[in-house]
Amino acid sequence: MIDTLRPVPFASEMAISKTVAWLNEQLELGNERLLLMDCRPQELYESSHIESAINVAIPGIMLRRLQKGNLPVRALFTRGEDRDRFTRRCGTDTVVLYDESSSDWNENTGGESVLGLLLKKLKDEGCRAFYLEGGFSKFQAEFSLHCETNLDGSCSSSSPPLPVLGLGGLRISSDSSSDIESDLDRDPNSATDSDGSPLSNSQPSFPVEILPFLYLGCAKDSTNLDVLEEFGIKYILNVTPNLPNLFENAGEFKYKQIPISDHWSQNLSQFFPEAISFIDEARGKNCGVLVHCLAGISRSVTVTVAYLMQKLNLSMNDAYDIVKMKKSNISPNFNFMGQLLDFERTLGLSSPCDNRVPAQQLYFTTPSNQNVYQVDSLQST
C-alpha cells in the first residue's frame, strides 16, 4: 500500500522562484526557452492555465515512486508530444513550475508539496527549475491575458481530457484477475490493453457504471435528462460548492450537495459518511445514483473510491484500481488521496498485497454475468 510521504524539504539551494511579473515579461517577449509545468489537478488545468503550460498533475499513488527515485520526470507524461517536448527542452530551457497558490512558501513551510518534490527531482536531473511565486491564482489575477480558459471543455463527456500519466503503470483494461493489481514497477509509458495494444486516450461518452446502481460522471452528465433517464438515475450527489442542482425544483430527483473545491486545503473526508449513506439510500430504493463534480476526475472519484472501500471492504489501492479500470482519466488531488489513506486506516483495511479480493467476486472485473458481484449482499458498516 502507499505509505505516507515524507516531506521533501525546500533546501536553500533549490528554493528558487520567479515572480509573476517576470513570467509575464518573458511571455510578452515571446521567450522560446521557457518551459511551463502546471502542477495542479487536471480538472483545474483544463478549466484554465497559463498559455503554453503542460500539465503534470501527479496522483498520490505515484509520488512515492518519484520520491524514491524510481521514476524520471519525463515518465510523468503519457502524451507523446508533451513527453517529447519536455525531453527535448528540459536541459536547455528555463523550467518554471506552478501550483494554485504558493505565495507563502519558504524553506521551512514548503516541504510537503508536490512542487518541492518535482523541483528537487528536476534539479537532480540537471534542469534549471524554478517555482512561480503566488502560483496560478496570482498570475491570473494580474496577467489574465496570458491565461487560456476553457469553460465548456471541462467535462470528459464532450471531449477527452488530457490523461495523467502517473497512473499509466496501472493495468486498466483486462478481464484477468491479476489486472486489478497496481503494477507500480512497470514502465508507466507501457500501459496496454488486454491484447497488448496501447491504451486509448478516449474516455466514455456518458456516466461510467461503477456498480449496477452507481454512476460516476461530470457536471454535464447531471444536466442531461436523456442520460439520467437512460440509466435510471434518480439520485444525484453533487460534489462541488457552486454548480447548480438543475432539476431540484422539479421533484423528480433527489439531490445532495457537498460544498468542496478541488484544492489541497479541503477536507472531503468529513463528508464521507453522509455521501455513503446517500448512495446507499439510492441502492435501497433500486434507483441509480450519479456522483459528479466538474470534470468527474477528482472529487467525485474520491467519494466513489471511499464508498467502495467501506461497502466492499477494499483497500484504497484495490478500490482505486476498480474505478481506474472503468474510467482511465481519473486524477484525485494529492490531499484527497491522503484522506483516503486515513479512511483506510479508520476502516482497519489491509494492504492490497495482503488481502486481495478474488476477481470472481467483483462485478467490475469482467462483463460476464457469471462473475457479477451480488450488490444486495453489501452490508452497511
UniProtKB/Swiss-Prot annotation:
Domain Rhodanese: 30-148
Gene Ontology terms: cellular component: cytoplasm; cytosol; nucleoplasm
Tissue specificity remark: Expressed in keratinocytes (at protein level).
Subcellular location: Cytoplasm
EC number(s) on file: 3.1.3.16, 3.1.3.48
Paired cysteines (S-S): none
Keyword annotations: Cytoplasm, Disease variant, Hydrolase, Hypogonadotropic hypogonadism, Kallmann syndrome, Protein phosphatase, Ubl conjugation
Region annotated Disordered, chain positions: 176-203
Modifications the protein undergoes after translation, according to the UniProt entry: Ubiquitinated by the SCF(FBXO31) complex, leading to its proteasomal degradation.
A Gene Ontology BP annotation from the UniProt entry: negative regulation of MAPK cascade
Active site: C293
Record SMART domains: DSPc, RHOD
Superkingdom of origin organism: Eukaryota
Function: Dual specificity protein phosphatase, which mediates dephosphorylation and inactivation of MAP kinases. Has a specificity for the ERK family. Plays an important role in alleviating chronic postoperative pain. Necessary for the normal dephosphorylation of the long-lasting phosphorylated forms of spinal MAPK1/3 and MAP kinase p38 induced by peripheral surgery, which drives the resolution of acute postoperative allodynia. Also important for dephosphorylation of MAPK1/3 in local wound tissue, which further contributes to resolution of acute pain.
PANTHER family membership: DUAL SPECIFICITY PROTEIN PHOSPHATASE, DUAL SPECIFICITY PROTEIN PHOSPHATASE 6
Reported disease: Hypogonadotropic hypogonadism 19 with or without anosmia: A disorder characterized by absent or incomplete sexual maturation by the age of 18 years, in conjunction with low levels of circulating gonadotropins and testosterone and no other abnormalities of the hypothalamic-pituitary axis. In some cases, it is associated with non-reproductive phenotypes, such as anosmia, cleft palate, and sensorineural hearing loss. Anosmia or hyposmia is related to the absence or hypoplasia of the olfactory bulbs and tracts.
Binding partners and assembly: Interacts with MAPK1/ERK2.
Membership in a protein family: Belongs to the protein-tyrosine phosphatase family. Non-receptor class dual specificity subfamily.
Protein name per the record: Dual specificity protein phosphatase 6
Top-level taxonomy: Eukaryota, Metazoa, Chordata, Craniata, Vertebrata
Name of the encoding gene: DUSP6
